């Protein structure tokens, strides 16, 4: 399945590009010159989430933002499982296809584990790490386990697939101010049917099902990436990734770090504080 939607060029003033991965066609943007920065989104978003950050950075950085299979304008290939390790494998193919070297990797939400999984396999090509409201280790937080089990239940899977629950409910809940109607339409239009939303529905299951991958990342990220310079940009009003439980492990993993607190931002920090994030990246790595 392919997605028939053309983003508003006033909001998303980028050229769409395509990569034929081993499992399906990937949509991405590749804007600007300079050190490459790989921008990894989470659930249920796509490269559109990074639009304002890309606009702010593309004079200094080469901004590369893919849509995972099952997300954004990328294909929904029949038979693809949408597991986190599968997404990471495809993003790894994409990074190799572009020949990214000396790159910054940024991840938010599931973009953390996916980006880190790609990075540990290519540590010699990674320049630095930017993480925001994410994680890369097995979760033992009770509320996260409950969220995974509830969202994996038949009634909530029905709501995700049939009613587009993650887009309609969790994006507004995860932003400090509800996004405008036209912004919401850009998230809604790329998930137009139950068949298009299989990737969105799988990700909450992966909070528990991807534990073997997260256990491996919990070991390999410190060992292979821990010496890299890091930047943490954190939405302080996020109820999913509260700074108290999350930031101490981030700090311990990356001793050479800078923390930028985003006091008004909730989970979707790229919507709530794009200018602050871009400024922090420029100050730290520009």
Annotate each PLM feature:
Residues 1-37, 58-61, 96, 100-101, ...:
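Alpha/beta-hydrolase fold catalytic core
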Residues 19-23, 29-31, 65-107, 279:
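Active-site loop/oxyanion-hole signature of alpha/beta-hydrolase fold enzymes
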Residues 29-73:
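Conserved HGGG/HGGXW glycine-rich cap/lid loop of the alpha/beta-hydrolase fold
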Residues 33, 236-239, 264-266:
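Acidic beta-to-alpha connecting loop that harbors the catalytic carboxylate
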Residues 101-142:
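Conserved hydrolase catalytic core segment
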Residues 139-202:
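Helix-rich cap/lid subdomain of alpha/beta-hydrolase
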Residues 196-252:
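Conserved serine/cysteine hydrolase catalytic core
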Residues 265-274, 278:
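Catalytic histidine-centered segment of alpha/beta-hydrolase-like enzymes
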